[in-house]
Amino acid sequence: MNAWEVNFDGLVGLTHHYAGLSFGNEASTCHRFQVSNPRQAAKQGLLKMKALADAGFPQAVIPPHERPFIPVLRQLGFSGSDEQVLEKVARQAPHWLSSVSSASPMWVANAATIAPSADTLDGKVHLTVANLNNKFHRSLEAHVTESLLKAIFNDKEKFSVHSALPQVALLGDEGAANHNRLGGHYGEPGMQLFVYGREEGNDTRPSRYPARQTREASEAVARLNQVNPQQVIFAQQNPDVIDQGVFHNDVIAVSNRQVLFCHQQAFARQSQLLANLRARVNGFMAIEVPATQVSVSDAVSTYLFNSQLLSRDDGSMMLVLPQECREHAGVWGYLNELLAADNPISELKVFDLRESMANGGGPACLRLRVVLTEEERRAVNPAVMMNDTLFNALNDWVDRYYRDRLTAADLADPQLLRGGREALDILSQLLNLGSVYPFQREGGGNG
């Protein structure tokens, strides 16, 4: 059956700021306390979405979350009106204010793990929300992510959206950023590659930075998504590269159809994994980048592998890269060699995503891949699909509500909270989502 990969990109939120909240993510840490530009960040993301849609790649948008998220501050013991809560936390514990104001939901590669209908036992598209429990600020996302996905994939005959796994370390799940699918045409059954960093009873794990994904979580997600057991491979990421800042597998590898583009040191027991994939995926091709040409450090700093590998109708592929790759002589030299070599990659497309990159999120972080048949695509909430009208409406919305300068101190401004809620209220109407945000259901959360 014919099917297409639709990229659902996260729209950057109004409180996008640099707080260094993500230990193990070196870009996040080294840009801590810099001044951010939320308006520019949102527009950079929108330009990528529109350019890819115009190039013929189906594209949709996932909206930001409510931030600052007052209900969690109340759970932490801050009381009074919303304004009083903001004032108290800013004065007594500003780190909590930064955490509950993070715009990290923009990186929707961590929103959920997807199983296309061609791979599932019941013939539905399955989406399991990620619990993201390794980082406090990201653990706050799951409930609203579930509401948003249910509003977008609202046809229960075709889509099953599963709640996140229990919030315990044993079941740490980071979503599609640790998941690849390999195979032929999108509508054919594919091989799902779940990548984990640690498992109970296995001493092979990183020592410097945390391994966020567990094998136990990956196995549970595969069960929830009803993936045919014959179409699943579990593989461990190389713990040494996690310790070098590869906090998700999509920082060191990306797949599309029959191609796996990865670093030579991406996986533990890599040669064994690639042999397994060759045996189980027709036409499988591994493009392994040697460490002698691109070091892990350079891969992390440029986000070479946090790229999008997209298929054209003629079978050729386009690699979507952040501008940092073009600015690094060694990486750009390798990429031009790659273009000249015998492989399906025939075009490089470069985007300026500096605002997201400075927090450790490249092109692949910003998108959630969902393979859909034509019938399934028609069943998706049409208001989220990118086109000229939506692009213009979202740009106008960003111009109206987003600031062009934001510091950690600005997060305590009650007007940022009020303006953000007004903006999301308008956006949820524009995207026909209904009442997906807690403030919409609870009358603003005062009291």
Swiss-Prot record:
GO terms for biological process: arginine catabolic process to glutamate; arginine catabolic process to succinate. The keyword Transmembrane helix does not apply. One of its GO terms (molecular function) is N-succinylarginine dihydrolase activity. Disulfide bonds: none annotated. InterPro entries: AstB_sf, SuccinylArg_d-Hdrlase_AstB. Pathway: Amino-acid degradation; L-arginine degradation via AST pathway; L-glutamate and succinate from L-arginine: step 2/5. It catalyses: N(2)-succinyl-L-arginine + 2 H2O + 2 H(+) = N(2)-succinyl-L-ornithine + 2 NH4(+) + CO2. Gene3D superfamilies: Succinylarginine dihydrolase. HAMAP family: AstB. This is N-succinylarginine dihydrolase. It comes from Escherichia coli O139:H28 (strain E24377A / ETEC).
